[in-house]
Amino acid sequence: MSNEELSALAPVGPAAYVYFTKTNHEMNEVLATLSLCDSSSPVVIAPLLMGLTVDQDFCTSVRTPVVCYDGGVLTKVTSFCPFALYFYNTQGIVDFSEPHGDVQRLCDETRQRYAIESYMPEEGRAPTDLAALCTAAGCDPQEVLVHVVVGNGMKEFMYAGQLIPCFEEAAPTRLNDCDAVRVPLYPPTLFGSLQADVDSDELSLDKRSSFVESRGLYVPAVSETLFYYVYTSWCQALRFSETKVLIEAALKQFVNDSQQSVKLAPHKKYFGYTSQKLSSLEKDHLMLSDAVICELGFSFASVFLDSAYGASDSMVYSEWPVVVNATDHRDLIRALTELKLHLSTHISALLFSCNSILYHNRLVYLTSNKNASGTGASQEVLLKSIHFANGLTGLCEDTYNDARKLIKCSGVVAKDERYAPYHLSLICGTCPQLFSAFIWYLNRVSVYNTGLTGSSTLSNHLIGCSSSLCGACGGTCCHTCYNTAFVRVQTRLPQMPRLPKKEPSVVVMQSRFLNDVDVLGTFGRRYSAESKEASLDAKADEGSASTSNRTASSSVDRTHRLNRILDYCKKMRLIDSVTGEDTMTINGRSDFINLVSSLNKFVDDEAMSFVSEVRMKSNRDEVLGATQAFNLDLNPFAVSFSPILAYEYYRVIFAIIQNVALITATSYIVDNPLTTSLVSRWVTQHFQSIHGAFSTTSSRKGFLFIRNVKSSKNADHDRLPDFKLYARGTYSVISMEIKLSRLSVPSLLMFRVKNRPISKASKGTTAHVFFRREHVPKKNPVKGCLGFLLYKYHDKLFPDCGFSCLQFWQKVCANALPKNVNIGDMGEFNNFVKFVISVTADYNEHDLIDVPPDCMLNYLENRFHNKFLCFYGFKDYIGTLHGLTTRLTYQNHAQFPYLLGESPNFASAADFALRLKDLKATGVTAPLASTVTRESLMRTIFEQRSLVTVSFSIEKYAGVNNNKEIYQFGQIGYFSGNGVERSLNTNSIGGQDYKFMRQRCILATKLSDVLIKRSRRDNVLFDEDIIKNRVMAALDSENLDVDPELMAMYEILSTREEIPERDDVLFFVDGCQAVADSLMEKFSRLQEMGVDDFSLVNLQQVLDSRPECGGGGGEVHDLSALFTAASGEAVGNSVGLNARGGEHAFDEDCGLLPAKRGRL
């Protein structure tokens, strides 16, 4: 896509549309399920989805006409906002929504409490007659839903009610199998006297011509929703309090390209400073940094959002597998609701984690003795001192103005000690629809009871609701109101931070495919030249020593070794060649010993060979520099399926831009001290230079990746309406020149999050205590590396023993196994137990990963890397990445009061228990809630395009070799708080041995086969592949009653009627010339004899010339002496020929090494 022409990605067209959709009951329910709505507002915030809210061929980015000049129009590139706003006849949608109490009143009180600006409709201006609007579009006002989609550059005009509908260009379309009409909206700048060089003061939210006054689409409810859902949130992210000033500035910024001018600083107030003990110099540095990154964030949000982005796979509603596979409407609603339940894990992380991106809107100066600035400060000191922190504290502090004078707080001064509904309303931008959506999730997440606050807390609350004194709903809907929701999750709510501190930020984004998340990540991995993201990374890391090993010319090839091991496992039928799932067959203890011993020997040999290769071609520093990395998508349409995630997307964008902007800001602040009385004056003096410096250095520094979409020509011709004539009442389409304001636009591509698995100890010191490995723990074999096999094949290994696997091994290890337990031959049993214990002990001796494997692929990778690291001299634990994927499980009815269906009216706990019993008796299904399970292979999360929640911080460091450039990288972090997800808690992971500090987790929901249709061929097996697998299995068969070559011939001929060609046979036997020659000789004999019956019995009769053995009881030569183990050898080497390789040894010289190495 990076080489795509701008004109193709963003065609000329309107950047706003109003849709009139003939709706029905089913459409309303689908919209209610996927949208944000509250009974206090007629506006429904819906997702931007092709086939549901916009056309199937909708263009997500356009070059839209903005200003007319003589003979043509000037166009600007913009992308659509990732949401749609329904505003007429929406009661049918809102009626499906769950009541949550008087949310509007709570939002109003929140604004008063924290001095947040409220929306005020224009005085004296009449709203647009929406019924007349429907009639003008040729629709019955009683039968249609009306909604609008708008581009980022047009949303301010939409807010101001200045977009002009052009009904002459109305076009029929279909949305979710409903008839619809689409009408374009044009900006007022096309119809007035504005020219490209007109003074920008003529452009305003309040100034408009009589034509715009009479024809503009003005819906106060839509303006109010934009005010809170978009702009109030933007103000919070920028630490700016004048919402209407920001809207006015955004309007002029798009039309007049004023990104390089100062717009917000003169109006900015600085909050959260008085509670910090800052010197005068530190306060100046913090205020300047605050003002500069606020301006850069606001300017570059316009640059990046008014750009070109293609549609994401997840926004094509009509192709969602959950939609396509639904059997009927009820099944569709069930599937969509379950999808939302999966998302509840991610929503929980955004709410319950103290370091959520939604809370990180405060800038703090954290000093230490090492970083103390004294009389001056370097850029390095400032970058180590200035951080984003949780902004829930200090909300009612006095603030500083532009003149650095203290201003008394105008809100209600209150000491917030506990997280309350006010705080949730605040982070929602006081948008009632968004707040209501969060409450829906809080009513459905799991309850985490504690010894102090057991399940009786919720039941006592519900019993008390009978008094109808609920402050949230007055007793009308206590089963779902926000007070009940907060009681349910009170043990999970985040703690209010007492002191500001540097913490990583928790975000929810969609993943990209490319990843390096195995044990050693980038080390020893070579990348194909075709990999676009790999080439991006190579460019990004120029001058950076920390990731220099992630290039296409890695000195060693670790992937080759892993592929050899995978090929061996496929050859031995231990794993499925397509899915990677375990497929081994174990019929007894000897099978188990042979399989494991042969596999261990092969893996250990590969690890030792890799050690030799690293010693010859690489060095220890390159191993220490191993980096695990994955990419997260910054395309706004990757999250357009959820308005909550679209809301959070803007917060992420502002946070990233401002955090990276700190580098540019601090470099100018250090060199140019504040000498004026006004902060805005200093910013005005330097902003143009700062803007230019940031635009050239913000990306390709290891963290943020941007692509430039270019146009080969700046002018074109097309047929458009004569806008000047249209303003006078006549519609006419003419050919005109179309100019593009910019030939190149930068668009956000992705950002990269990394982790260093190997802890670097300073010279002369030991590793950090979290990674230190001071002793080797002894483990019960069932809890060790072979545990997954011992569990799976317990019945095969010890048939009729009468004990479960865990109990059996506990008794064995305790020397307490009763004599009446059937264990078979005692000698064989002793050998098996010794073997299992020795393998477990050997694995533990080298286990630096400290994560028990749960499948064969897991075991292989862990053993290989453990052995390599130990053989190479590493002794301490390493850090690991873990993917926790969501799944739905049934829960207790009593913890989900929304199932009651009405406000509770219970006199006692017995009444409540009786009501629950009635619910179960009447067939009310147990509620589902989202939990997580650990993914065996982390990379599958990225290969199956998942929605991921991850915590990361943006770290900055200087380049090498006297390079003054400052580089960044996203460092994976932690989730702060015990209520995020129980699997993340210290006690769940391992608190006593610091395992929780070595493991970094991400939460994930796989979108493949849910929202994204698989478009790539995932190793589909052709018929020839299946035949080949059968032939190879026949050649490896241990069945002594059938000649393996005859069995192979039978498999080849089973699907054909003619003798195969030699090339086909060579393919079936995996390129082994000797076997192919032997088979072809037999095929020739069949052809000469004219045989046409290719059954196995007939092939044996025709070709098998072995002497008869006279049944199975004949005498045989005693060859046991050939296989007698030397006395004193380890148990693992005394169990038979396979312990030393034997017939399962995988020798490269045998000619059976698979020619193709496919990646699972």
From Swiss-Prot:
Region Required for nuclear localization: start-end pairs: 1139-1160
Keywords: DNA replication, DNA-binding, Host nucleus
Locations listed in the record: Host nucleus
A GO CC annotation given for this chain: host cell nucleus
One Pfam short name: Viral_DNA_bp
Highest taxon, organism lineage: Viruses
SUPFAM superfamilies xrefs: Viral ssDNA binding protein
UniProt keyword annotation of DNA-binding present: yes
GO molecular function, a single term: single-stranded DNA binding
Motif Required for filament formation mapped to chain: 808-809
Annotated signal peptide: none
GO terms of biological process kind: DNA replication
Quaternary assembly: Homooligomers. Forms double-helical filaments necessary for the formation of replication compartments within the host nucleus. Interacts with the origin-binding protein. Interacts with the helicase primase complex; this interaction stimulates primer synthesis activity of the helicase-primase complex. Interacts with the DNA polymerase. Interacts with the alkaline exonuclease; this interaction increases its nuclease processivity.
Role, per record: Single-stranded DNA-binding protein required for DNA replication.
Family of the protein in this entry: Belongs to the herpesviridae major DNA-binding protein family.
Protein name: Major DNA-binding protein
Organism: Simian cytomegalovirus (strain Colburn)
Gene designation: DBP
